[in-house]
């Protein structure tokens, strides 16, 4: 018989930097989860993604056990890293802060495809290119 789910917690945590301080500790403590056990497991699982904020979905069961799923870093983080910028622009129509090649966009699509709401790489490339444009990053050939 399946365990009874009592809650689902969605967080974005820097890879390998989960610790009991806010926001992780209070969010998990409210559901009665062993915070240190989660932190150790999360840090171990994300050791190869250093430098990114990792979305994580934690499912908490009635017996206070948990499972978690890590997703790929947000598209904006991948775009910023590929374009070599620290942040996007506040006015993407006037200010361009960086450039991405189509090859870089396809590289981001390969990483992000499992989290996007499409299975078509061309459509996924349009989604990533749109995110880049809204940050003031040009997509060039």
From Swiss-Prot:
Post-translational modification (record): One or more lysine residues are methylated.
Entry keyword set: Methylation, Ribonucleoprotein, Ribosomal protein, RNA-binding, rRNA-binding
Keyword match Cytoplasm: no
Family annotation (InterPro entries): Ribosomal_uL11 (IPR000911), Ribosomal_uL11_bac-typ (IPR006519), Ribosomal_uL11_C (IPR020783), Ribosomal_uL11_C_sf (IPR036769), Ribosomal_uL11_CS (IPR020785), Ribosomal_uL11_N (IPR020784), Ribosomal_uL11_N_sf (IPR036796)
Gene Ontology biological-process entries: translation
SUPFAM superfamilies assigned to the protein according to its UniProt record, in alphabetical order: Ribosomal L11/L12e N-terminal domain, Ribosomal protein L11, C-terminal domain
Gene3D superfamilies assigned to the protein according to its UniProt record, in alphabetical order: Ribosomal protein L11, C-terminal domain, Ribosomal protein L11/L12, N-terminal domain
SMART domains from the UniProt entry: RL11 (SM00649)
GO CC term, one of those recorded: cytosolic large ribosomal subunit
GO MF term (any one): large ribosomal subunit rRNA binding
Domain of life: Bacteria
NCBIfam families: L11_bact
Subunit structure: Part of the ribosomal stalk of the 50S ribosomal subunit. Interacts with L10 and the large rRNA to form the base of the stalk. L10 forms an elongated spine to which L12 dimers bind in a sequential fashion forming a multimeric L10(L12)X complex.
Function: Forms part of the ribosomal stalk which helps the ribosome interact with GTP-bound translation factors.
Family of this protein: Belongs to the universal ribosomal protein uL11 family.
HAMAP family: Ribosomal_uL11
Name this protein carries in UniProt: Large ribosomal subunit protein uL11
Species for this entry: Campylobacter concisus (strain 13826)
